[in-house]
Design a protein with these regions (language model features):
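C-terminal partner/receptor-binding element of secreted or periplasmic proteins
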Residues: 124-169
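A short, solvent-exposed beta-edge/loop patch
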Residues: 96-137
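Short glycine-rich, low-complexity/disordered patches
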Residues: 40-46, 95-103, 137-155
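N-terminal secretory signal peptides
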Residues: 18-65, 71-75, 79-80, 88, ...
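Sec/Tat-exported extracytoplasmic proteins
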Residues: 31-38, 89, 132-139, 143
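Sec-dependent N-terminal signal peptides
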Residues: 4-13
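Short, internal acidic amphipathic alpha-helical interface segments
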Residues: 68-110
Length: 169
């Protein structure tokens, strides 16, 4: 009797669970809540956060998404700056990373699309923007700062601002 009940519950519970997977449509709505002037382009969705351009690219068939912020031309990067970016990728860039592609330095966050949560995405956008803002100085995603400086408050202010734009979708 208990085996039958367990079998029924095991195979029907999933059918009643609400699907909370991130979709391209849901992510696009979150982006529009962040920046109502965001534009859908052939390459993705372009938005602006604090005067910094952000490009979000999605590949639903591959279950991937990428948020990218252009930072600098590779030609202008010194070996010392490149080394500093690699160090930052290890300890201060956090979930976002410095990357090089198409002769540019980028702040990039890459994640499986379906597993992405709203707050995680908003934190990722804040981190990629902070990589651009702190390039050449702190090289920090800003989410975790050790010590009593001002950086954590600046980062938290950006995350709070993004969280307050729009409703949960």
């Amino acid at each position: 009797m208990f085996r039958i009940l367990f079998f029924i519950l095991a195979f029907t519970t999933h059918a009643f669970a609400q699907d909370t997977s991130m979709t391209a449509e849901r992510l696009a709505q979150i982006i529009m809540d962040i920046d109502p002037d965001a534009a859908i382009t052939p390459s993705g969705i372009e938005l602006t956060i604090e005067d910094i351009p952000v490009l979000v690219v999605m590949a639903p068939a591959a279950d991937r998404m990428r948020a990218m912020v252009p930072i600098a031309s590779v030609e202008d990067v010194t070996p010392e700056e490149m080394s500093r970016m690699m160090q930052a990728n290890f300890d201060t860039a956090l979930d976002a990373r410095y990357a090089v592609a198409q002769d540019r330095v980028w702040g990039v966050f890459i994640h499986p699309l379906g597993a992405l949560e709203r707050e995680q995405f908003l934190s990722a956008i804040a981190q990629t923007v902070n990589l651009a803002r702190t390039y050449g100085t702190l090289y920090s995603g800003g989410a975790q700062v050790f010590g009593g400086g001002d950086s954590n408050d600046i980062y938290q202010g950006l995350v709070d601002d993004l969280l307050n734009r729009g409703q949960d979708i």
